[in-house]
Amino acid sequence: MRNLSRLSVLALAMLAANPAFAAGGGISLKNTDFVVLLGLLVFIGILVYFKVPGMIGKMLDSRAEGIEAELNEARALREEAQSLLASYERKQREVQEQADRIVEAAKEEATIAAEQARADLEVSLARRMAAAEDQIASAQAAAIKEVRDQSVSIAIAAAQDVIAKQLTAADANALIDGAITEVEAKLH
């Protein structure tokens, strides 16, 4: 740093000296260019004496270090942001896949439930049909039995009328005795 400040002072002195000597007049306090050159050299000397170039260099170095640190921090933050973004994208894909699986499972469950409901309905309808057929058969059997019973009752009544008109008292007693004998034989 120190070499840089000396080198910059030397370069400034050489650049400033050329216009002063080019004006012609030589070294004299009446020559304004020379006086300006002297003022410049004194000013530069004061700056060097108070180590202003070193301070400026330190300030520039610290600013450069600060900028470099900020750039490194920005790089680290960018990398962290990229990793977070990749992580969130991965999580989003996983969540989407899980949601797709849930939807697919729900569709399958709904299909299975619909098929089960259809099967249950068919079983229920079959049971109801069987119950209705049983009721119809039972009603038909009851109707047939009732018709037979009425037919038998009518036939018995008709037979009683016919027998009552054609049967004499002696024949009736003989029939009653035969029936009693038949009942006794069957019971013993």
From Swiss-Prot:
HAMAP family tied to this protein: ATP_synth_b_bprime
Keywords: ATP synthesis, Cell inner membrane, Cell membrane, CF(0), Hydrogen ion transport, Ion transport, Membrane, Transmembrane, Transmembrane helix, Transport
Protein name stated in the entry: ATP synthase subunit b 1
Function noted in UniProt: F(1)F(0) ATP synthase produces ATP from ADP in the presence of a proton or sodium gradient. F-type ATPases consist of two structural domains, F(1) containing the extramembraneous catalytic core and F(0) containing the membrane proton channel, linked together by a central stalk and a peripheral stalk. During catalysis, ATP synthesis in the catalytic domain of F(1) is coupled via a rotary mechanism of the central stalk subunits to proton translocation.
Signal peptide, first to last residue: none
Similarity comment text for this entry: Belongs to the ATPase B chain family.
GO-annotated molecular function: proton-transporting ATP synthase activity, rotational mechanism; proton-transporting ATPase activity, rotational mechanism
Subunit structure, as described in the record: F-type ATPases have 2 components, F(1) - the catalytic core - and F(0) - the membrane proton channel. F(1) has five subunits: alpha(3), beta(3), gamma(1), delta(1), epsilon(1). F(0) has three main subunits: a(1), b(2) and c(10-14). The alpha and beta chains form an alternating ring which encloses part of the gamma chain. F(1) is attached to F(0) by a central stalk formed by the gamma and epsilon chains, while a peripheral stalk is formed by the delta and b chains.
Gene Ontology annotations for the cellular component aspect, listed alphabetically: plasma membrane; proton-transporting ATP synthase complex
TM regions (residue ranges): 7-27
InterPro entries found in the cross-reference section: ATP_synth_b/b'su_bac/chlpt, ATP_synthase_B_chain
Membrane topology note: Single-pass membrane protein
